[in-house]
Swiss-Prot record:
InterPro entries: DNA_Rcmb_RecR (IPR000093), Rcmb_RecR (IPR023627), Rcmb_RecR_Znf (IPR015967), TOPRIM_dom (IPR006171), TOPRIM_RecR (IPR034137)
GO biological process, alphabetically ordered: DNA recombination; DNA repair
CDD domains: TOPRIM_recR (cd01025)
GO-annotated molecular function: DNA binding; zinc ion binding
Zinc finger (C4-type): 57-72
UniProt entry keywords in alphabetical sequence: DNA damage, DNA recombination, DNA repair, Metal-binding, Zinc, Zinc-finger
The protein's name: Recombination protein RecR
Species lineage: Bacteria, Bacillati, Bacillota, Bacilli, Lactobacillales
Length: 199
């Protein structure tokens, strides 16, 4: 038996989310169908607002409602360091840790030639332009996930940045190989930042 078209479409849409297979998508679709109408409307409005009201900061690439973002506008941030991360969720992880007070730069991905992702497909050009314009920057912290693609991206960036005379560091060991920063606890992140090493 086939599901009615509205349920089938909802299942298909849930399956577009990462880590959601057909069984989970089906459960979510039927749960959504049983939700009070007000909750469903609020949920759908939230989805639309995320797409309409959030965009990338023109300076760092983080998600924001205003441009530049709150972090880039904050005069109390340490402007001598820029931490380069893969995704906006990594910024959130470091901010929740509460130990880092510098600036960020979000790449929105990592180099992955097998997937057709080269330097032009991620936010590298704006990082280099930013480093050329902001004289107060002394250190670039490469806080990329410890996947093979993250490591390759870190090495690529280090080769681009070092000739400018800036200190380039990498997070210390402590993050398991292949692990994502967003899943690390705050103690692990704190130790990784404090024990960062030169590249």
């Amino acid at each position: 038996m086939q599901y009615p078209l509205p349920i089938a479409r909802l299942i298909d849409n849930y399956m577009k989310l990462p880590g959601i297979g057909e069984k989970t998508a089906t459960r979510l679709a039927f749960y959504t169908m049983d939700m009070p109408e007000d909750d469903v409307e609020d949920f759908s409005k939230s989805l639309i607002q995320v797409k309409e009201n959030l965009h990338s900061c023109s300076i760092c690439g983080n998600i924001t409602e205003s441009d530049p973002c709150e972090i880039c506008r904050d005069a109390n941030r340490d402007r001598s360091t820029i931490m380069v991360v893969e995704q906006p969720k990594d910024v959130m992880a470091f901010e929740e840790m509460g130990e880092y007070n510098g600036l960020y730069h979000v790449l929105h991905g990592v180099l992955s030639p097998m997937d057709g992702v080269g330097p032009e497909e991620i936010n590298i050009k704006s990082l280099i332009t930013r480093l050329q314009k902001q004289d107060e920057v002394k250190e670039v912290i490469l806080a990329l996930n410890s996947s093979p693609e993250g490591e390759a991206t870190a090495m690529y960036l280090a080769k681009l940045i070092k000739p400018a005379g800036l200190k380039v560091t990498r997070l210390a060991a402590g993050l398991a190989v292949g692990s994502d920063i967003e899943y690390a606890n705050s103690i692990t992140l704190k130790r990784a930042v404090q024990g960062r090493t030169d590249l």
